[in-house]
């Protein structure tokens, strides 16, 4: 018989072995939590992977996978699914999960274009409490919530984000910082107040001052940038210059000693081609001077209706107006200037150069490919044209090495180092209108357009620019012929300030509670259009005859106290406004090129005389004059961000693709007179 003491000792010795076996057996059935690496950003996957992991997990691990799936869905543009999954999150979350939930809520708000809602949520987050990868997302959300509007808060967010980024993202951050700085006016920059310890921000603001002082002198700009880099060697922008300033340092002026002018001289568009040629040659022979952009002109007397040339949709005419039957038949009178507030101008001129060799090529007589080959053989240093959109498309396909100032732009802009695009089109004017209306603080615009391809193009251009500026839905309403409008007036129907969305959005949200965020879908389009007079701006694209019916019809249906400001394109302004028309248009704002707004009276008189007082052709004449200025400053427009010419067709600047943006003059009918819009 074995002694009992021996049995007890043997059992005691076996116990640790048994316990260890049990422990290891338990570990063998437990799967490690893999969600941590994904939460911290050291590993990434798509939403399908996260959703699968979520279904196979439980408790905190399941919540982590759910949060990751929401983040991925937002990134993939699947906002509706993200909202649905977000609303399924449990109430009980740990601190880390709560912070992630709030950050996700802000990111969803941004995806739904609810920028105010996103800003409210971001204000509840303390960046120092976040993980490093969350901090980068937080600052990006702050940047996105600013909608690109330059401000001190946007600059601070960009500066805070920069150290958290990789090399590629750093360049994007630095470019965005410079974009914010260079988008400010000098007046905005002068109002900025910073703290004494914000050394990086101070450096950026000093670079901004260098740019303000020298942006129209590339040589001075180069020297200023080099000096700034020496004074601020530790600034991120000094170590990695903004791309636009790298281009400045590489600046080389283009030659205009031998110019090829490509225009249609036969067929339907010939009238425009020959008018542009007239303006270009006049500027070449007598030079150009900066134009006062904010001077209005009011007709001194009734002005006769002038026949307007009818053109194909592809022609770059800004105001293809039909004949109005509501204007007088007296001889045309010259506009009289009206005083206006002085504004700072970019003092850039293009001197006369009569000796420069200019050769005209008719794009209506032979294929563009043959013309371009001939231009190269002739040794042209710069090409101005072509004018028609289909010819510009052909130009891009040719991959010509020549510097080209195209007088139109294709449907899809291509960034070519040797091409700039200068268009006088209704779409270009609509984009300026979107910027002007947005600057006036309007939130809910309606576009009133003719039922035509022209109307569709204008509506799309306006909506695209509006949303690029951070705006939401744009509504459109179409009208028919003048006879249909007349019938509407006679029938007393009026025009309601409602419409259909130009670019409907599947989901935007209406609100979120503070303690338990819940994301909801957007109000319907009917709710948007009928929600207590939400429309606060109406942009009208109409001829003088059409707008003479449209404005009274809006008042007839909505009353004079509708709260919506009315705006119109230059299509409604053809130099035909008599005193009755001006009184009827009371309060209406409309856009016009500075030359015809009284900013350059000598040239206006010269242009109107050359085109028999046809305002549409006068605009094309001004385009020819500005084309000379742009050709003489081609390299500056192409390479120097912020370079500006106060031209006859607008204040001219170039975007990164070298599309020439035109800031137009805006005028207003007031007590029978035309004055600068306030």
From Swiss-Prot:
Superkingdom of the source species: Bacteria
Biased composition (Polar residues): 311-327
Lipid attachment site numbers (N-palmitoyl cysteine): 27
Keyword tags: Cell outer membrane, Cell shape, Lipoprotein, Membrane, Palmitate, Peptidoglycan synthesis, Signal
Membrane topology category: Lipid-anchor
A GO BP entry: regulation of cell shape
Lipidated residues (S-diacylglycerol cysteine): 27
Pfam families: LppC
Entry-linked InterPro entries: LpoA, Lytic_TGlycosylase_superhlx_U, Peripla_BP_I, TPR-like_helical_dom_sf
Low complexity: bias regions: 300-310, 330-340, 513-528
Region (Disordered): 300-340, 496-528
Database matches in CDD domains: PBP1_YraM_LppC_lipoprotein-like
Annotated signal peptide: 1-26
GO molecular function, one term: enzyme regulator activity
GO cellular component, as recorded: periplasmic side of cell outer membrane; periplasmic space
Role this protein plays: Regulator of peptidoglycan synthesis that is essential for the function of penicillin-binding protein 1A (PBP1a).
Subunit structure: Interacts with PBP1a.
HAMAP family, alphabetized: LpoA (MF_01890)
The protein's name in its UniProt record: Penicillin-binding protein activator LpoA
């Amino acid at each position: 018989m074995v002694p009992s003491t021996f049995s007890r000792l043997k059992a005691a010795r076996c116990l640790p072995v048994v316990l260890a076996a049990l422990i290891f057996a338990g570990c063998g059935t437990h799967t490690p939590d893999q969600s941590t690496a994904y939460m911290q950003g050291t590993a990434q996957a798509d939403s399908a992977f996260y959703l699968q992991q979520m279904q196979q997990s439980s408790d905190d691990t399941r919540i982590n996978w759910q949060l990751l799936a929401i983040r991925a869905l937002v990134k993939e543009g699947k906002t509706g699914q993200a909202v649905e999954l977000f609303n399924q999150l449990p109430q009980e979350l740990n601190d880390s999960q709560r912070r992630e939930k709030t950050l996700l809520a802000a990111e969803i708000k941004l995806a739904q274009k609810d920028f105010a809602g996103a800003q409210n949520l971001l204000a509840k987050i303390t960046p120092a409490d976040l993980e490093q990868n969350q901090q980068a997302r937080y600052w990006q959300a702050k940047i996105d919530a600013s909608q690109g509007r330059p401000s001190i808060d946007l600059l601070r967010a960009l500066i805070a984000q920069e150290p958290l980024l990789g090399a590629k993202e750093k360049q994007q951050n630095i470019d965005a910082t410079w974009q914010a700085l260079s988008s400010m006016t000098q007046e905005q920059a002068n109002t900025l107040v910073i703290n004494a310890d914000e050394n990086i921000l101070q450096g950026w603001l000093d670079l901004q001052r260098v740019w303000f002082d020298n942006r129209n002198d590339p040589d001075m700009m180069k020297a200023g940038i080099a000096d700034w880099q020496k004074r601020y060697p530790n600034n991120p922008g000094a170590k990695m210059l903004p791309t636009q300033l790298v281009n400045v340092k590489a600046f080389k002026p283009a030659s205009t000693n031998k110019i090829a002018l490509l225009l249609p001289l036969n067929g339907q568009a010939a009238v425009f081609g020959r008018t542009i040629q007239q303006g270009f040659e006049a500027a070449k022979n007598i030079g150009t001077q900066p134009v006062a952009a904010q001077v209005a002109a009011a007709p001194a007397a009734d002005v006769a209706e002038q026949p307007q040339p009818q053109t194909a949709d592809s022609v770059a005419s800004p105001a293809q107006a039909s004949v109005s039957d509501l204007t007088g038949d007296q001889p045309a009178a010259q506009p009289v200037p009206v005083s206006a507030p002085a504004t700072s101008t970019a003092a850039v001129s293009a001197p006369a150069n009569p000796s420069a060799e200019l050769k005209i090529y008719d794009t209506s007589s032979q294929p563009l490919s043959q013309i371009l080959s001939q231009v190269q053989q002739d040794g042209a240093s710069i090409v101005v044209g072509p004018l028609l959109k289909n010819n510009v498309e052909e130009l891009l396909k040719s991959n010509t090495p020549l510097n080209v100032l195209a007088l139109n732009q294709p449907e899809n802009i291509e960034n070519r180092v040797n091409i700039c695009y200068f268009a006088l089109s209704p779409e270009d004017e609509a984009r300026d209108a979107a910027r002007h209306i947005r600057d006036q603080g309007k939130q809910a615009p309606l576009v009133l357009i003719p039922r035509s391809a022209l109307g569709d193009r204008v509506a799309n251009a306006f909506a695209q620019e509006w949303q690029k500026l951070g705006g939401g839905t744009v509504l459109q309403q179409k009208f028919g012929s003048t006879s249909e409008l007349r019938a509407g007036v006679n029938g007393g129907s009026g025009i309601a300030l409602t419409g259909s969305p130009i670019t409907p959005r599947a989901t935007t949200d209406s609100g979120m509670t503070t303690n338990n965020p819940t994301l909801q879908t957007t109000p319907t389009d009917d709710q948007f259009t009928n929600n207590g007079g939400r429309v606060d701006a109406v942009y009208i694209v109409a001829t003088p005859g059409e707008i003479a019916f449209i404005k009274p019809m809006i008042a007839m249906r909505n009353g004079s106290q509708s709260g919506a400001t009315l705006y119109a394109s230059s299509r409604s302004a053809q130099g035909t406004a008599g005193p009755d028309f001006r009184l009827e248009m009371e309060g209406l704002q409309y856009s016009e090129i500075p030359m015809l707004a009284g900013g350059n009276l000598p040239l206006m008189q010269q242009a109107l005389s050359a085109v028999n007082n046809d305002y549409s052709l006068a605009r094309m004449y001004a385009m020819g004059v500005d084309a000379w200025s742009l050709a003489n400053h081609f390299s500056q427009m192409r390479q120097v961000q912020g370079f500006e010419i106060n031209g006859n067709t607008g204040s001219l600047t170039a975007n990164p693709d070298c599309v020439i943006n035109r800031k137009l003059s805006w005028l207003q009918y007031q007590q029978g007179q035309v004055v600068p819009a306030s």
